[in-house]
């Protein structure tokens, strides 16, 4: 005779919970990325910390390591992050500024060093004068007596014959012409003073130079009215 198996009733454990019952699913809170929700969550977190100050952990205690119990020595706590300086933030002074400040300090403490330092004076270079031989001077004088000015080919030919440079020949002719003109001018003035009718003993006065009389004598035929205006007259008139 067949027995029908009776269905077993589920065993209920203490607390009214069945072992075959599915474990309760924990509701997971979804994270909202809205600005209002983010600000509200942040305000709630700050409010919770501020409401229980006595239960808030000390960050310095958490960060500080515990002393070594075996050796009895503790490790010094590190500096807070706010006190640390990165190499990039450390102000470094340029080396050139340091040298400049050191130089200024030396000058302030020793002002007499600059005055006692020897000053090198650069003397102007003297222009060397060309020394002509007696034969060269005779040939130059002979050429100058015939021709006061030389062209470029003539100057080059004369310099080659006398073993001189063209610049030396050119400068010698320039100086020779200047001396000739000055000598001629002084001779003309001497002749004019000798032949002048105003060359009387009364004219030999320091207040009336002879050069002014010569200029008056030469300009009188052209400007006779100057003597009628009374602006100037010799001392013997």
UniProtKB/Swiss-Prot annotation:
Disordered: annotated segments: 1-96, 108-130
Function, in words: Transcription factor, which binds preferentially the consensus sequence 5'-TAAGT[AG]-3' and can behave as a transcriptional repressor. Plays an important role in normal prostate development, regulating proliferation of glandular epithelium and in the formation of ducts in prostate. Acts as a tumor suppressor controlling prostate carcinogenesis, as shown by the ability to suppress growth and tumorigenicity of prostate carcinoma cells. Plays a role in the formation of minor salivary glands (particularly palatine and lingual glands).
Top-level taxon of the source organism: Eukaryota
Biased composition (Polar residues): 24-34
Gene3D superfamilies: Homeodomain-like (1.10.10.60)
GO molecular function, one term: sequence-specific DNA binding
PANTHER family found in the cross-reference section: HOMEOBOX PROTEIN NKX, HOMEOBOX PROTEIN NKX-3.1
Name of the protein in its database record: Homeobox protein Nkx-3.1
Induction / repression: By androgens. During embryonic development, induced and maintained by sonic hedgehog in pre-somitic mesoderm, in immature somites and in urogenital sinus, but not in the other expression domains.
Post-translational modification: Ubiquitinated by TOPORS; monoubiquitinated at several residues and also polyubiquitinated on single residues.
Gene: Nkx3-1
Main location per the UniProt record: nucleus
Disruption phenotype: Defects in prostate ductal morphogenesis and secretory protein production. The bulbourethral gland displays prostatic epithelial hyperplasia, which increases in severity with age. Mice also display morphogenetic defects of minor salivary glands, which are reduced in size and exhibit severely altered duct morphology.
Alphabetical list of InterPro entries matching this protein: HD, HD_metazoa, Homeobox_CS, Homeobox_NK-like, Homeodomain-like_sf
Compositional bias ranges of the Basic and acidic residues kind: 1-14, 38-47, 57-71
Subunit composition and interactions: Interacts with serum response factor (SRF). Interacts with SPDEF. Interacts with WDR77. Interacts with TOPORS which polyubiquitinates NKX3-1 and induces its proteasomal degradation. Interacts with FEM1B.
Tissue specificity remark: Expressed mostly in the male urogenital tract, with highest expression in the epithelial cells lining the ducts of anterior, dorsolateral and ventral prostate and in the bulbourethral gland, and much lower in the seminal vesicle and the testis. Expression in the prostate increases during sexual maturation and is drastically reduced following castration. Expressed also in brain (hippocampus and external granular layer of the cerebral cortex), kidney (intralobular arteries), thymus and adrenal and salivary glands.
Homology family: Belongs to the NK-3 homeobox family.
Residue ranges the UniProt entry marks as DNA-binding: 125-184
Protein location: Nucleus
């Amino acid at each position: 005779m067949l027995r029908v198996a009776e269905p077993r009733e589920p065993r209920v454990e203490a607390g009214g919970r069945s072992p075959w019952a599915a474990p309760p699913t924990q509701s997971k809170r979804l994270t909202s990325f809205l600005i209002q929700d983010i600000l509200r969550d942040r305000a709630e977190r700050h409010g919770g910390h501020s409401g229980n100050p006595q239960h808030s952990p000390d960050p310095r205690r958490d960060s500080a390591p515990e002393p070594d119990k075996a050796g009895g020595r503790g490790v010094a706590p590190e500096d807070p992050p706010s006190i640390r300086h990165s190499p990039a933030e450390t102000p470094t002074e340029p080396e050139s500024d340091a040298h400049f400040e050191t130089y200024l300090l030396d000058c302030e403490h020793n002002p007499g060093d600059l005055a006692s330092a020897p000053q090198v004076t650069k003397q102007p270079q003297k222009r060397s004068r060309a020394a002509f031989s007696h034969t060269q001077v005779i040939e130059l004088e002979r050429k100058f007596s015939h021709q006061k000015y030389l062209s470029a080919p003539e100057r080059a030919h004369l310099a080659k014959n006398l073993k001189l440079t063209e610049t030396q020949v050119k400068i010698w002719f320039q100086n020779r012409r200047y001396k000739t003109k000055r000598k001629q001018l002084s001779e003309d003035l001497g002749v004019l003073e000798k032949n002048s009718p105003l060359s009387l003993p009364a004219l030999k006065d320091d207040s009336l130079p002879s050069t002014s009389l010569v200029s008056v004598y030469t300009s009188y035929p052209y400007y006779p009215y100057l003597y009628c205006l009374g602006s100037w007259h010799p001392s013997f008139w």
